[in-house]
Amino acid sequence: MEHYISLLVKSIFIENMALSFFLGMCTFLAVSKKVKTSFGLGIAVIVVLTISVPVNNLVYNLVLKPDALVEGVDLSFLNFITFIGVIAALVQILEMILDRFFPPLYNALGIFLPLITVNCAIFGGVSFMVQRDYSFAESVVYGFGSGVGWMLAIVALAGIREKMKYSDVPPGLRGLGITFITAGLMALGFMSFSGVQL
């Protein structure tokens, strides 16, 4: 149990997808204007990561891993296309659920919801799972923790950006300029966790 708690904390803070690996920056910067929208996208990312990492773990271990289906057959060259297909299917299902049951959130997320399919944070989580050879249980914890870490980062950035509307930002830095600086300072703050050994 202690191993899973340390993996969860590690994936949220120490190996944060957005602020340590800089994955998923396109939606991270574009959707972080309002806390409410950022929170909704963060929840969607948590759901997709929590489901796609373990599902892709099963697909990899049962089908794609060398000698998984038949001894001597290595289908690992199909990793990328298979993982993207699984992620796309899960995002499509999530999109239909949000459209049916949460129309305001679906409309607020707009084009960014289908973009979760190609969000490199999602694909990064799946790739790290394969690279680190996580078990099924570890992949569930890692997927959930990575999603929570990404949501924590985007909601924090959105909160800061909402407060910056009332600040005296120099004209040359307004918009994405000050957002990049803020994200960089947040990443420096999260770097302080890198010395923690779990």
UniProtKB/Swiss-Prot annotation:
Coiled coil: none annotated. It comes from the Bacteria. It is an enzyme of class 7 (translocase). GO terms for cellular component: Gram-negative-bacterium-type cell wall; plasma membrane. Its EC number is 7.2.1.1. The chain crosses the membrane at residues 11-31, 39-59, 77-97, 110-130, 140-160, 176-196. It catalyses: a ubiquinone + n Na(+)(in) + NADH + H(+) = a ubiquinol + n Na(+)(out) + NAD(+). GO terms for molecular function: oxidoreductase activity, acting on NAD(P)H, quinone or similar compound as acceptor. The keyword NAD applies. It is found in: Cell inner membrane. Keywords: Cell inner membrane, Cell membrane, Ion transport, Membrane, NAD, Sodium, Sodium transport, Translocase, Transmembrane, Transmembrane helix, Transport, Ubiquinone. Its main location: membrane. Belongs to the NqrDE/RnfAE family. NQR complex catalyzes the reduction of ubiquinone-1 to ubiquinol by two successive reactions, coupled with the transport of Na(+) ions from the cytoplasm to the periplasm. NqrA to NqrE are probably involved in the second step, the conversion of ubisemiquinone to ubiquinol. Composed of six subunits; NqrA, NqrB, NqrC, NqrD, NqrE and NqrF. This is Na(+)-translocating NADH-quinone reductase subunit E. It comes from Vibrio cholerae serotype O1 (strain ATCC 39541 / Classical Ogawa 395 / O395).
